[in-house]
Amino acid sequence: MIKKKVLTQEQITEKLDYLRKQRDGLIVGEYRNYLYKLYMYLKERCSETEDGSCNPYPWQMLVALGRDDLHKSYVGYTYCDDLETLGYIKMQGYGKDKKIFITKEIDF
């Protein structure tokens, strides 16, 4: 069993504030852009299935992010973990049986 990150509501609020500041140009960085691009990619993929889930390959997520470091397959799942911790997606299962669901609209 993989242990998932657990944040307090205050930590989630702080992280979302940081992401919104990146969106608004108050903080320089690509982290918010990567999370946003991945969310939009997952939302599109999930909308194509009957049960509203998707299970993209790691390299597909990196291509969607515009990253050329395809050997770093863990990067996409790291961002998925962050999106799940913040409450935007839900992941179930593992490996080929993993399912990703969109749980709420992105607001950062």
Feature map (PLM): residue ranges:
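Winged helix-turn-helix DNA-binding recognition segment
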Residues: C46-T103
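Residue-level marker of intrinsically disordered, low-complexity segments enriched
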Residues: K4-K5, E10, G25-L26, G87-I89, ...
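Short, amphipathic alpha-helical interaction segments positioned at domain boundaries
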Residues: I106-F108
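Short recognition helix of helix-turn-helix/winged-helix DNA-binding domains
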Residues: M1-Q60
